C-alpha cells in the first residue's frame, strides 16, 4: 500500500525539479511558466495526500482554489507573452528586461 511518505517524497521531487527548472533555464519564459505550474502541482499533490490520509476534505477543496488561480495565472502569463513576442519578436528573458526609452 502506498503511504503518505510516498506521496510527500514524490511531491518533494516534483518541487525540486521545478526549482531546478527555474534556476537552470532563465532564458525562456515558457519554461519558467511551466516550472512555476509544476511547482504549484507538487504543492497540490501534497495537499491532496494530507487531506486523504487525515480524512478531511478541506485540503481537496483548497486544491480547487489553487488550480483556479494557477489557470488564471497561466492565461494571463501567456497573454502577456504573446504581446511581448508580437512587439519584440523574442521570448528570451534577457532580451525582455531592456526598456525602450
Curated annotation (Swiss-Prot):
Membrane topology, as annotated: Multi-pass membrane protein
GO molecular function: NADH:ubiquinone reductase (non-electrogenic) activity; quinone binding
Domain of life per record: Bacteria
GO aspect biological process, one term: ATP synthesis coupled electron transport
Gene: nuoK
Entry annotated with the keyword Electron transport: no
Location in the cell: Cell inner membrane
Catalytic reactions of this protein: a quinone + NADH + 5 H(+)(in) = a quinol + NAD(+) + 4 H(+)(out)
InterPro entries given in the database record: NADH_UbQ_OxRdtase_chain4L/K (IPR001133), NUOK/Mnh_C1-like (IPR039428)
Keywords: Cell inner membrane, Cell membrane, Membrane, NAD, Quinone, Translocase, Transmembrane, Transmembrane helix, Transport, Ubiquinone
Family classification: Belongs to the complex I subunit 4L family.
A Gene Ontology cellular-component term: plasma membrane
Main enzyme class: translocase
Protein name, as recorded: NADH-quinone oxidoreductase subunit K
EC number(s) per entry: 7.1.1.-
Amino acid at each position: 500500500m502506498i503511504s503518505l511518505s510516498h506521496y510527500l517524497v514524490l511531491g518533494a521531487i516534483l518541487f525540486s525539479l521545478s526549482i531546478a527548472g527555474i534556476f537552470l533555464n532563465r532564458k525562456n519564459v515558457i519554461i519558467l511558466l511551466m516550472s512555476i505550474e509544476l511547482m504549484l502541482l507538487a504543492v497540490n499533490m501534497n495537499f491532496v495526500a494530507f487531506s486523504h490520509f487525515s480524512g478531511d476534505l478541506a485540503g481537496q477543496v483548497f486544491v480547487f482554489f489553487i488550480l483556479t488561480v494557477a489557470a488564471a495565472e497561466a492565461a494571463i502569463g501567456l497573454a502577456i507573452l504573446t504581446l511581448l513576442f508580437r512587439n519584440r519578436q523574442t521570448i528570451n528573458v534577457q532580451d525582455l528586461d531592456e526598456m525602450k526609452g
